[in-house]
A protein has these predicted regions:
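Hydrophobic alpha-helical transmembrane segments
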Residues: 93-141, 309-313, 327-348, 388-391
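Membrane-interface junctions at transmembrane-helix termini in multi-pass inner-membrane proteins
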Residues: 17-22, 71-95, 278-309, 349-353
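Alpha-helical transmembrane segments of multi-pass membrane transport and lipid-handling proteins
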Residues: 4-6, 33-59, 63-64, 234-284, ...
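Helix-loop junctions and terminal segments of transmembrane helices
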Residues: 6-23, 202-241, 291-296
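Membrane-proximal transmembrane or re-entrant/amphipathic helices at the cytosolic face
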Residues: 375-420
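Interhelical loop/hinge segments that connect adjacent transmembrane helices in multipass membrane
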Residues: 63, 117-121, 133-176, 219-231, ...
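Transmembrane helical elements of multi-pass membrane transporters/channels
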Residues: 98, 120-139, 152-221, 280, ...
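Small-residue hotspots at the loop-to-helix junctions and early N-terminal turns
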Residues: 62, 189-200, 270-275, 331
Length: 420
């Protein structure tokens, strides 16, 4: 949580303004240098605050905590620089390196040295430092730093973009944390375990969507000033809606067929909540697509306040209903809060960009969702197999403009590799 204040979300501004100036080297240098000054000043000030607090109240592992904050801040900065420059291969490789090195360090410290909780901080700090060093080497980061390139107007411009993203990030954190705190307080840790189990499945969907969303935020920022941007954004929003509604419903049906293997009989009560949370996470992903458009438009204020409103709604609904409907309050409040964010963001985007969801597809999607809903709660394997087959045929047909070119592209790539 402290990381949001340490960085002021300036790394997101680096991505947005570097991608906008890919062909303007001097502007890139000025933005990166100016942003690095903001980061170093904030990280330095945060270090002094930590030292001051530690002198009054001892902070456990204070050196590791400070190192981890610096490491994460620096890594986030250069990783967003890589995205802004279009170095997506390096971005993916670095993400892999950070994940693997964190895992290896944790295993060595926990298994080999029995270090316990401290291993998490060590792994966090050093894995991010490794990723940072990789980016510095691959991107030649020093070429983007020039002492005389600091520009106060560019700093102001970037902060206007990044500061509204702080309440946005904090609100997401509060929304995710408040559910669990409210559940523990009113219902107990056993129910929190059930809710945690129910949330495991939506993370599968989130992992798939994140890959798409990373590419989307880049492409929409590149296209935002094009003459045909409305046509492009509308097309991509509709394609994203079609593809991920299909993926989401596919996961729902697969869960109904394999719940006891995936989650286990001891968490049987999680079954009903998974459906609600999967629908909620789909709406959340559509919020992210709209957030990408707003980011491209540099309207981060809307991103910030819509998330704050959603987080408040989530907490209020949860508090109001948890004593009457129990754990369902958490899953329903999550769904409703995401829907609120989606509605507000859609209205904001439609004021600037033409977006129209296909009415015909929406009717078909709702009809298919009702069928999936019936099969999910009826819980007969043979029926859900039939539904899965029907859903697959329907989904492939609806997404043929995406899937068939993708398949042909993969075939051509494989053919080229064979010839080489």
């Amino acid at each position: 949580l402290a990381l949001y204040f340490v960085t002021l979300q300036i790394e997101n501004a680096v991505f947005r303004f570097v991608i906008e100036n890919r062909t303007k080297e001097d502007d890139q240098i000025s933005y990166v240098t100016s942003a690095s000054v903001v980061l170093l000043v904030m990280a330095g000030a945060s270090t002094l605050i930590i030292i001051a607090i530690n002198s009054l109240y001892a902070i456990p592992y204070v050196t590791l905590v400070t190192t981890a904050l610096w490491a994460q801040s620096l890594y986030l900065f250069v990783s967003n620089l890589a995205r802004g420059l279009g170095r997506n291969a390096d971005y993916s490789i670095a993400s892999f390196i950070v994940t693997v090195s964190s895992l290896v360090i944790n295993i060595i410290l926990i298994v080999g040295f029995k270090s316990g909780a401290v291993s998490i901080l060590v792994a966090l700090a050093f894995s991010n430092l490794i990723g940072f060093v990789y980016f510095v080497y691959r991107l030649h980061v020093w070429k983007f730093i020039r002492v005389g390139a600091v520009n106060s107007k560019k700093i102001q411009e970037m902060l206007q973009y990044s500061l509204p993203l702080i309440p946005n990030a904090i609100s997401w954190w509060i929304a995710n944390t408040s559910d669990r705190l409210i559940i523990i307080y009113f219902l107990g840790t056993a129910f929190n375990g059930i809710y945690a189990a129910a949330n495991k499945i939506p993370t599968i969907y989130t992992t798939i969507f994140t890959v798409f969303n990373t590419a989307w935020t880049e492409s929409v920022s590149l296209a935002i000033n094009d003459s045909d941007r409305d046509e492009y954004i509308n097309s991509m929003m509709n394609n994203g809606f079609k593809l991920f509604s299909f993926v989401n419903m596919g996961i729902i049906v697969c869960v109904s067929l394999s719940f006891r293997w995936l989650i286990g009989k001891q968490y049987e009560e999680a079954y009903n909540h998974i459906f609600i949370l999967l629908v909620a996470i789909f709406i959340n992903s559509m919020c992210s697509l709209l957030g990408g458009v707003l980011g491209g438009l540099k309207d981060t204020k809307v991103i910030g306040w819509t998330t704050v409103v959603g987080a408040i709604a989530n907490a209020l609904i949860n508090f109001a209903l948890i004593q009457s409907i129990g754990l369902y309050a958490a899953s329903i409040s999550t769904l409703v809060s995401y829907l609120i964010i989606y509605i507000f963001r859609l209205k904001a985007v439609k004021k600037v960009v033409y977006i129209k969801v296909s009415g015909e597809y929406l009717v078909q999607c709702l009809a298919m969702l009702l069928i999936v809903f019936w099969g999910y709660f009826y819980r007969k394997s043979i029926i859900n197999v039939v539904i899965l087959i029907a859903l697959t045929v329907w989904g492939i047909f609806q997404n043929r403009n995406i899937l068939f070119p993708l398949i042909n592209s993969i075939k051509n790539k494989l053919a080229q590799n064979k010839e080489e």
